[in-house]
Amino acid sequence: MQYQSEVIEFLDEIHKAGVRYLLIGRRSIIAYGGPVQTMDYDIYVDNNPENLDLLFKIAKKYDLVPNKSKEEIRKHFMFKLENDFSIDVFCPKFFSAGKGKKLSFVELYDRRSIAKGEKGFEINLPAIDDLIALKKLGSRPKDLEDIQYLEGLKQIKGE
């Protein structure tokens, strides 16, 4: 699929340019070896203006256009970059995890794992425990399946 390679090229470029991001959602489960499928790409990005400007600059090279204005993005903290493919972009400073707990981008980014692929490709992933916490926010059946996989992976790794 052509769009798949374009998405990979885009992710590679934002990584190499130093955009502060994490691949989240089911694509991150796949990156951890999970036997799941998805067509979606979701990223969580640092919402400081310089970081978002760098993301938008690179997106423009791929003719990816935000589906919301910058003002709307600042209010809602979620948007899509769209063209022949789309990427869901989340950019709140933190997600509320209930009981006063917060999952902040800065903390998740500081604990990130970097997955390495072919030809020098690298991608930022949340640490397994952080990905479990993010998946618990969804609590859909597929999120629960993903959590089971990640818990099993932790056991295998001895964590």
Task: Enumerate the predicted regions with their spans.
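Compositionally biased terminal segments of proteins
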Residues: 1-159
